[in-house]
C-alpha cells in the first residue's frame, strides 16, 4: 500500500514525520486560502460587513455613503454571512431573537478569544485529533493503518468547508470538539477491552463533555449522542442475556450520565433564552407557550425557513446539485462502515457506531436543512475521510494490499482543491452559496 500511495502524494507530505508534515501542510494551505480571500476585489452584493466598524455613527446619509465605498480591512474580509451575526453577538450580546439560531457556546468562547485565531487553532488541533483518532481505529503498527491515519488528516486540511474553517464560524471549533470526542470515545473502548474500567469510564464521560460543548456550538452535535444510545442498548442486551451484574450496571450508569451530559449542551442555551424572553414583564413570544418552548426551533422556522422539506423548491435545485457529492459520500460511507469487516475489534466497533451520526446528518441535511451547508458541517465527521482513503485498495484491512484506483483518488483531491479555491473567491466577495 505504501508504494502505491507514494505515487499519489506530494513530496511535502511525509508519513514518517506526520506531525511536522501535517503542520506544514496546514499552515501553507491556510496562507493560500487567506491570500485568496483578501485578494478578492470587492464586497459583492452585500455590504453588511462594512456596517460593523461604524454602526454607532452611521445615522447620516453621508456616513452610510462612506461605508458603502470604504475599503474593508483584511480581518473584515473574513466576516461574511453568519459570521456577521457572530461578531455582533460577541460585541453586543444576544440582542435580537433570531440571533439565538447561532451557537451559544461558540459566541461565549469568542468573547475570550479572537475569532479568526480561534478558527485556525481549532482547525489545526482537529487535524491532529483526527490523526490520533485514526491511529486508535486502524492501528499504527502496520503501514496501511499509518497511511490511512495520515492521509485522512490531510484530507481534513483541504476539506470542502474551506474558507469557513478560517472565518468566524463555528465549524472549526465544532470539528475539533466532535473529533476529539470521538478520539476519547475510541480510547474508552480500547481501555474497556484492556480491562481498564476506571480509565474507560472516565474517558467516556470526558467524551460526553466534549460532545455537549460541541452541541452548544452547533446543534447537530447532539447526533453524537447516538453512540451512547447504542452502548446503552448493548448493556441492556447483556442484562437480558447474561443477567444483572455490578459491572454491567456501573457501565450502564456511566453511559446514561454521559447521555444526559450531552443533552445539556442543547438544554442549557434553551433555558437561558427561556428565562430571558419568557420570564420577563414583556409580552410573551409565541414559542414561549409551545409544549416544548425552544427558541432555537422557533427562530429556525420563523426567520430562516428551516424545516422538513421547506427547502425543496425548484429554485434551490442548484444547491441540491452542489450538495449531492457530499451527501453521497456521507451516505455511502455510513453503509461502508456497517458492511466492512475489519481485523481489529476496535475498528469494527467504532466504525459501526459512527455510521449513525454520519448517516443521520446526511438525511437531515437532505430533508430539513439549507442543504448546501452539508459541505461545511461535514468537516467534523471523519467517516467519509476514511471511506475515500480506503477506496484506494481493494482490501484495505490487509496491510499488504496494493493500492488501486489512485487516479480516482487524485481526481477527488483535485476536485476538493478546486472547490475550495472557487469557494474562497465567492466567500471573499460575499457571494453565494454560503
Curated annotation (Swiss-Prot):
Pathway: Glycolipid biosynthesis; glycosylphosphatidylinositol-anchor biosynthesis. It comes from Aspergillus oryzae (strain ATCC 42149 / RIB 40). It holds the Pfam family Mannosyl_trans2. It is found in: Endoplasmic reticulum membrane. It is a multi-pass membrane protein. One of its GO terms (biological process) is GPI anchor biosynthetic process. Belongs to the PIGV family. This is GPI mannosyltransferase 2. GO terms for cellular component: endoplasmic reticulum membrane; mannosyltransferase complex. The chain crosses the membrane at residues 22-42, 109-129, 145-165, 170-190, 210-230, 252-272, 311-331, 354-374, 377-397, 411-431. The keyword Transmembrane helix applies. Keywords: Endoplasmic reticulum, Glycosyltransferase, GPI-anchor biosynthesis, Membrane, Transferase, Transmembrane, Transmembrane helix.
Amino acid at each position: 500500500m505504501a508504494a502505491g500511495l507514494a505515487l499519489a502524494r506530494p513530496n511535502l507530505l511525509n508519513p514518517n514525520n506526520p506531525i511536522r508534515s501535517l503542520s506544514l501542510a496546514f499552515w501553507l494551505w491556510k496562507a493560500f486560502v487567506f491570500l485568496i480571500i483578501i485578494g478578492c476585489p470587492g464586497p459583492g452584493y452585500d455590504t453588511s460587513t462594512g456596517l460593523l466598524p461604524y454602526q454607532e455613527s452611521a445615522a447620516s446619509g453621508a456616513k452610510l455613503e462612506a461605508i458603502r465605498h470604504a475599503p474593508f480591512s483584511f480581518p473584515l474580509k473574513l466576516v461574511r454571512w453568519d459570521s456577521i451575526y457572530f461578531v455582533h453577538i460577541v460585541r453586543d450580546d444576544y440582542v435580537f431573537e433570531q440571533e439565538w439560531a447561532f451557537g451559544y457556546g461558540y459566541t461565549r468562547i469568542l468573547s475570550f478569544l479572537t475569532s479568526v485565531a480561534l478558527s485556525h487553532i481549532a482547525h489545526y488541533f482537529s487535524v491532529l485529533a483526527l490523526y490520533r483518532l485514526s491511529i486508535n481505529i486502524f492501528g499504527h503498527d502496520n503501514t496501511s493503518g499509518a497511511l490511512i491515519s495520515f492521509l485522512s488528516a490531510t484530507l481534513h486540511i483541504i476539506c470542502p468547508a474551506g474558507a469557513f474553517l478560517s472565518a468566524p464560524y463555528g465549524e472549526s471549533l465544532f470539528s475539533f470538539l466532535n473529533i476529539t470526542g470521538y478520539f476519547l470515545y475510541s480510547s474508552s473502548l480500547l481501555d474497556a477491552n484492556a480491562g481498564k474500567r476506571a480509565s474507560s469510564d472516565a474517558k467516556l464521560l470526558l467524551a460526553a463533555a466534549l460532545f455537549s460543548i460541541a452541541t452548544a456550538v452547533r446543534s447537530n452535535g447532539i447526533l453524537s449522542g447516538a453512540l451512547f444510545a447504542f452502548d446503552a442498548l448493548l448493556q441492556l442486551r447483556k442484562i437480558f442475556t447474561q443477567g444483572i451484574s455490578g459491572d454491567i450496571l456501573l457501565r450502564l450508569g456511566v453511559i446514561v450520565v454521559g447521555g444526559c451530559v450531552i443533552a445539556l449542551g442543547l438544554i442549557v442555551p434553551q433555558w437561558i433564552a427561556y428565562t430571558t424572553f419568557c420570564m420577563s414583564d414583556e409580552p410573551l413570544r409565541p414559542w414561549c407557550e409551545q409544549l416544548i418552548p425552544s427558541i432555537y426551533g422557533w427562530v429556525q422556522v420563523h426567520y430562516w425557513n428551516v424545516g422538513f422539506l421547506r427547502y425543496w423548491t425548484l429554485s434551490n435545485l442548484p444547491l441540491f446539485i452542489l450538495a449531492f457529492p457530499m451527501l453521497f459520500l456521507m451516505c455511502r460511507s455510513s453503509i461502508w462502515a456497517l458492511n466492512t469487516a475489519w481485523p481489529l475489534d476496535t475498528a469494527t466497533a467504532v466504525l459501526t457506531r459512527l455510521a449513525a451520526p454520519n448517516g443521520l446528518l446526511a438525511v437531515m441535511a437532505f430533508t430539513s436543512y439549507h442543504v448546501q451547508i452539508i459541505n461545511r458541517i461535514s468537516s467534523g465527521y471523519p467517516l467519509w475521510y476514511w471511506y475515500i482513503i480506503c477506496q484506494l485498495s481493494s482490501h484495505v484491512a490487509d496491510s499488504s494490499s496494493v493500492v488501486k484506483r489512485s487516479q480516482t483518488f487524485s481526481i477527488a483531491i483535485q476536485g476538493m482543491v478546486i472547490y475550495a479555491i472557487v469557494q474562497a473567491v465567492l466567500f471573499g466577495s460575499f457571494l453565494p452559496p454560503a
